[in-house]
Amino acid sequence: MFRVLNKVFDTNQRDVQRIVKTVVQPVNALEEETMKIENLAEAFMRLRQRVQEGGESLDDVLVPAFALIREAGRRAIGKRHYDVQLIGGTALHQGRIAEMRTGEGKTLVATLALALNALEGKGAHLVTVNDYLARVGAEEMGLLYRTLGLSVGLITRDMQPHQRQAAYACDITYVTNSELGFDYLRDNMAQSREQLVLRADNPLHYAIVDEVDSILIDEARTPLIISGAAEKATDLYYVYAKLVKRLQRGEPAEPGKRTEPTGDYTIDEKGKQVHLTEQGIAKIERLLSLGDLYSPENMDKAHMITQAIRARELYHREKDYIVNAEGEVVIIDEFTGRSMPGRRYGEGLHQAIEAKEGVKIENENQTLATITYQNFFRLYDKFAGMTGTAKTEEKEFLDIYGSDVLVIPTNKPVIRQDADDLVYRTRMGKYQAVVEEVKQMHATGRPILIGTASIDTSEQLSALLKQAGIRHSVLNAKYEAQEASIIAQAGRSGTVTIATNMAGRGTDIMLGGNAEFILGEAIEQNFGISRFTPEAEAFIKAIGREDPEAVTLGLRIPGMTEQFIRQAQQLQKDIIADRERVRELGGLHIIGTERHESRRIDNQLRGRAGRQGDPGSSRFYVSFEDDLMRLFASDRVVAMMDRLGMDDTQPIEAKMVTGAIERAQARVEDRNFGIRKQLLEFDNVMSKQRDIIYAQRREVLLGTDEDVEESTEGMIADFTEMQLAFYAPIDQPAESWDLETLRTNMLEAVPQLEHYDFEALRHMAPEAAHAHLLEAVADAFDARKAELGPTMLNSLARYVLLQVVDQHWKEHLHGMDVLRQGIGLRGYGQRDPFTEYKFEATNMFNDMIDNLKADVTKFIFRMQFGQAS
């Protein structure tokens, strides 16, 4: 085992040394020369020209680019990138996951890879977990980017579409994972190019995901969903169920008997389809006072009426479905005869059957668009990630995202002391021990951070600390900006802070407090300007250096007084003094109140202490009533406590126990990874389908008129070939062809074929017959184009394609949801649920595409002039 571990560390070390040799040393060699460059923006733009016009790769210009970015950091924000930060920036550029300890300056490291990748002119995204961190990153690093001539955008929750367009058009954009994901989904529901907010040409080029383990592992299974209320149409299903009772079933046209179909609709039992006749269309329009049934505003109504007829004529109670005691329509498996609870017909058919039966129609939000973070970030041309804890999850990053983890060396050695766990019999015994430890530490003035796994635990501990008379702050990840403010000061002497695991993530805890943070907040509150303006930044930096020029710089800020400046100078002195005091006391002490299922989360909590070479310590308190211990701890440990006669207040402290806990965590991590990987396999089926639909939409939205016309003609030809394959198959004798149904179906879609002699097809060679009908349909399309004019036809085609694709995709998503939920209930015996899901999902998708092409054909040939406007 140790040999394997050594091999892992050797590989990491070799990679680091390679970057030192090929990047760090050459960048350092350029430093003196770069400091002499007066206009960094001009120099950086010359690199942009080399990449965009000269054909050089980003790797070709990496060294001079990093040298310029480092110098921009020094000049603009007073922060020069350390050598280890250059290593981190290189890893991010390479599309790797960079593991960097807390306090190592991830925000600054990201500027290297973001600015470098922005040279391609395709945009670079910094993705973080909340609006507050996105704003701080964009504003704090904005000066650096602007010094290089790069534009910086920020996306926040409350922005309007035009503001989002401007932000995404910038060279570098800071955005939260949820806003980015939802913008992507909304763009794929847009009805015109002008509605797109992401770049039209290459929306997802390069991204760095901050706190990458949180987004791509902890939130990996949480899908982003845009939904709309489906209940609006519920009453209409009942209306149409009554309407179709007033329609008459007819017979299709039949040579020698009828030249036209009779009745209001005809039935195709073989294909389980219904077809409205001209008489039926006119009757529906009259009964509903609709005008044209095939006008844009009536598209959904035409679809729902067709489904109501199918429900009435083709789906029968006790054969295709039952109505159970709860009044639910439950499908019967046609092969086994068993009911399939949880399964629903797609595309509105199930609701139509519910309306026919007079039972309650299921009210639910209709999914309009959805994607998981796992599949979303894999759409990027290249993405990287950074976090304090990633190595324990490297297998998952590699298997799912193809990204390895590079552990970046710390700038200064880590000297934090991590004690073995203390294990108690009961949870309350553990909490009492935590309070005693806090009392003792607090008496010395040492700052303490208590990490909890839940809000409930933090409130319990808070109540116990109040009883003990210990003042403290409680954080539970509800208020992002206030949270950062409190966590930034958690390193001051005498401070006790309770925080849930994720609270304040992304904000450093500095011993003695964070003077820059306090001063920045005071400037914003007192003078109404951002702490990131050049004037405020210069003043804050001068205070931090204890520079006498701080007085002159401060008085340049409108409204600032000498009294405020003196208070700022005193604050800096107090914090420096307090920092030394806290260091002498041993630094920040971390108390973990239980072990998390993931070692990574525990390591994140520990990593709060010991930043940048500071002293610090950590210890976890565990009880046998904790979930992890209850489910996974060895019975031997419990038995040992019993043998020793230990009571609730006596702990075990032994490496054996700590090791047992970590082995339990590794087992849980493996299990959770397996679950995520299995779910991803299911998601990948949907992902491939989504890629096809979104590519089709994008082609319609952004393509030329010629592209759209070609797509439309292709769909019409596909629909025609589909009908021919079904009713006049080449491999069957012509005498057996069902030309009557072929005629009915084709006339419903292409009424311009009313004079076409379908019976004549029987007397041609099969291939010639197919070609003849296809040519007739192509002629009908040309006639339609001549009738409407090319411009009007293309407007109509774009509109119809988008509307039809969106309607069918929305209904398909619902069907996929139902399939996913019901797949485990299907009694497949020894058959693999995933194989069955993939098979059924593929069939559903193919059916949807066929129906989509049929609807496009129908609307293109039937819609009246002016209705698409």
Swiss-Prot record:
This is Protein translocase subunit SecA. Belongs to the SecA family. One of its GO terms (biological process) is protein transport by the Sec complex. The lineage of its organism: Bacteria, Thermotogati, Deinococcota, Deinococci, Deinococcales. Keywords: ATP-binding, Cell membrane, Cytoplasm, Membrane, Nucleotide-binding, Protein transport, Translocase, Translocation, Transport. InterPro entries: Helicase_ATP-bd, Helicase_C-like, P-loop_NTPase, SecA, SecA_CS, SecA_DEAD, SecA_motor_DEAD, SecA_preprotein_X-link_dom. It holds the Pfam family SecA_DEAD. The keyword ATP-binding applies. SUPFAM superfamilies: Helical scaffold and wing domains of SecA (SSF81886), P-loop containing nucleoside triphosphate hydrolases (SSF52540), Pre-protein crosslinking domain of SecA (SSF81767). Monomer and homodimer. Part of the essential Sec protein translocation apparatus which comprises SecA, SecYEG and auxiliary proteins SecDF. Other proteins may also be involved. It is a peripheral membrane protein. Part of the Sec protein translocase complex. Interacts with the SecYEG preprotein conducting channel. Has a central role in coupling the hydrolysis of ATP to the transfer of proteins into and across the cell membrane, serving as an ATP-driven molecular motor driving the stepwise translocation of polypeptide chains across the membrane. It comes from the Bacteria. ATP binds at residues 85, 103-107, 508. It comes from Deinococcus geothermalis (strain DSM 11300 / CIP 105573 / AG-3a).
